[in-house]
């Protein structure tokens, strides 16, 4: 156990140490400062802009940024949707996998577009290699879009008055070419040399020791898995995701994949400090996020190491902890750490079955996605936290009787209304979706087109855990996470379409909100800092932000958690 805990702590510390220089590098990229890699990437980027006809030097306001962002996403959604819809008739399909039905193609295209990768299919039999390649490219697009949006907000937070906030396409292309692609190559090579396949050949047939023949799925997995973690996307090449022995063969690859999903969310926080030349401010943000992360991960690891009390009452020793649904090559400690890292960061990849997690662990996984403000995904993590900063500044200003100010700009009614709407949107989508599904399940409604049979048919685990499965599905969708309690039968029109709608609303509205707030604040008159200015780089302000997150984000979900994982916890006692 001590060795397992040492491995977990080492991965976390190494990720933080490496994130600081990466954050400095990212800040230089978005500031258009010179870097050592300019001779390599400048010609590539010039070529991309030339063939696309984009003027990367044109300066945009926040509305133009938003228009460019939505346009890119719309184009790639329709292209990917039609490829999935007709993949059975297209090339690069050596295993003859069939085309997707429209509802599943709709859900899958949206899911990869919005950095969620919910995956209501199994990669071995659900998609062709051509579709996998397009989905892999969407993982670059979704991560690059989030980082470009964050870069615009960084620019707006500088100490001046302007509506010129850089160029979206410049931020987007540089995020992909200079950050996502190099890191993905490093991770892909590490996976390739550790046994992860990288081929366009179809299934391989092997003979087992018992003399049976078995078909083994393979494909261009190493490249797909690399960007899935670097871009905090989380979609697995194989159905079992990173629990699959070819997707995550060893403890070393497990450590690499964990580091890969931590590094950019950490680095973006430090990049903000370097970009604004306010490093202490970024340390406060990182400190708040880390405290929140530790409050989630410590109970999870302890719960998994202690095992299942129901099994203990049977007199069975659980020396290795709660091993149901886990891989022996990883163990419960690093698996518990991964489960919180992947839900806090919004990656959504899994190296175990979350449906088999202990109730305390399941509640922490849910709470991580419900809060959706600690670290977060590529770019959008800092945007989610930005909303809570605005609310904390507003509340702090009211408490001391001053007009709220943030980085020299007055926070007024319009900004607060936008921030409040975005903060309320997350629980609204999760709880309303869960209420709808629960209503149908409780009444055993005949679903017709929406589901083959009555609504209780999508629950393999009735009772408290069945409710948790439905709650988890909508929470994962709203947090753009993509992991799931896979006891839920979710590949049907009801779940594909309802979660698809939640995916769209929960991705783009929380991006539009921070962009609008940042754009409005950037246009306001800059007020120099004075003795009465609220300091945002202090521990007191960090505590205030944490309190706002706890009250607005966490407490909103307590009744739902009480009906699901908390009730299940007490039934095991």
UniProtKB/Swiss-Prot annotation:
The keyword Secreted belongs to this UniProt entry's keyword annotation: no
Sequence similarity: Belongs to the KdpA family.
Stored Pfam families: KdpA (PF03814)
GO molecular function: P-type potassium transmembrane transporter activity; potassium ion binding
Quaternary structure note: The system is composed of three essential subunits: KdpA, KdpB and KdpC.
InterPro entries noted in UniProt: KdpA
Keyword list, A-Z: Cell inner membrane, Cell membrane, Ion transport, Membrane, Potassium, Potassium transport, Transmembrane, Transmembrane helix, Transport
Taxonomy of the source species: Bacteria, Pseudomonadati, Bacteroidota, Flavobacteriia, Flavobacteriales
GO-annotated cellular components: plasma membrane
Localization (cell): Cell inner membrane
Origin superkingdom: Bacteria
Membrane topology recorded in Swiss-Prot or TrEMBL: Multi-pass membrane protein
Record-annotated membrane-spanning stretches: 3-23, 72-92, 134-154, 179-199, 256-276, 282-302, 380-400, 418-438, 501-521, 540-560
Name of the gene this protein is made from: kdpA
Protein name stated in the entry: Potassium-transporting ATPase potassium-binding subunit
Function per UniProt: Part of the high-affinity ATP-driven potassium transport (or Kdp) system, which catalyzes the hydrolysis of ATP coupled with the electrogenic transport of potassium into the cytoplasm. This subunit binds the periplasmic potassium ions and delivers the ions to the membrane domain of KdpB through an intramembrane tunnel.
């Amino acid at each position: 156990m001590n060795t397992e805990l040492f491995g977990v702590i080492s991965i976390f510390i190494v990720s933080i140490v490496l994130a600081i220089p990466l954050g400095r590098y990212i800040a230089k990229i978005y500031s258009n400062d010179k870097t050592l890699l300019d001779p390599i990437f400048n010609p590539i980027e010039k070529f991309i802009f030339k063939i696309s006809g984009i003027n990367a030097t044109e300066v945009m306001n926040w509305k133009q940024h938003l228009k460019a962002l939505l346009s890119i996403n719309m184009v790639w959604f329709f292209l990917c949707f039609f490829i999935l819809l007709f993949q059975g008739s297209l090339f690069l399909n050596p295993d003859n996998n069939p085309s997707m039905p429209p509802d599943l193609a709709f859900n899958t295209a949206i899911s990869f577009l919005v950095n969620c990768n919910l995956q209501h299919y199994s990669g071995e039999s659900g998609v062709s290699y051509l579709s996998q390649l397009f989905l892999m490219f969407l993982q670059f697009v979704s991560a690059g879009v989030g980082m470009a949006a964050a870069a615009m907000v960084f620019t707006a937070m500088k100490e001046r008055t302007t509506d010129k906030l850089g160029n979206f396409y410049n931020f987007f292309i540089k995020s992909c070419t200079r950050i996502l692609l190099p890191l993905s190559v490093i991770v892909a090579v590490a996976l390739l040399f550790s046994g992860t396949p990288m081929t366009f050949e179809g299934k391989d047939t092997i003979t087992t020791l018992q003399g049976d023949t078995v078909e083994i799925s393979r494909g261009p997995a190493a490249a797909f898995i690399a960007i899935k973690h670097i871009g905090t996307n989380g979609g697995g090449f194989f159905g079992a995701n990173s629990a699959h022995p070819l997707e995550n063969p060893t403890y070393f690859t497990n450590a690499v994949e964990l580091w890969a999903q931590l590094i950019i969310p950490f680095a973006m926080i430090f990049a903000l400090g370097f970009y604004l030349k306010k490093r202490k401010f970024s340390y406060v943000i990182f400190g708040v996020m880390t405290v929140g992360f530790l409050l989630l991960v410590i109970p999870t690891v302890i719960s998994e190491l202690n095992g299942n009390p129901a099994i203990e009452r049977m007199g069975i020793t659980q020396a290795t902890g709660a091993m149901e649904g886990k891989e022996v090559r990883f163990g419960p400690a690093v698996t518990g750490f991964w489960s919180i890292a992947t839900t806090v960061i919004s990656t959504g990849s899994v190296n175990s079955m979350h449906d088999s997690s202990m109730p305390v662990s399941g509640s922490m996984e849910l709470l991580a996605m419900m809060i959706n403000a600690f670290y977060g995904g590529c770019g959008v993590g800092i945007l989610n936290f930005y909303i809570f900063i605005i609310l904390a500044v507003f509340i702090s200003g009211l408490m001391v009787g001053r007009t709220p100010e943030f980085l020299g700009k007055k926070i007024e009614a319009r900004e607060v209304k936008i921030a409040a709407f975005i903060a309320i949107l997350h629980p609204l989508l999760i709880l309303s979706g869960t209420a709808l599904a629960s209503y149908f399940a409780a009444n055993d409604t005949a679903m017709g087109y929406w589901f083959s049979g009555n609504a209780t048919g999508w629950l393999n685990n009735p009772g408290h855990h069945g409710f948790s499965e439905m709650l988890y599905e909508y929470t994962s969708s709203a947090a753009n996470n993509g992991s799931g309690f896979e006891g839920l039968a979710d590949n049907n029109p009801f779940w594909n379409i309802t979660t698809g709608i939640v995916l769209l609303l929960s991705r783009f509205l929380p991006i539009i909100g921070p962009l609008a707030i940042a754009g409005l604040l950037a246009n306001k008159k800059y007020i120099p800092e004075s003795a009465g200015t609220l300091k945002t780089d202090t521990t007191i302000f960090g505590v205030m932000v944490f309190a706002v997150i706890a009250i607005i984000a966490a407490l909103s979900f307590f009744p739902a958690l009480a009906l699901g994982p908390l009730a299940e916890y007490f039934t095991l006692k």
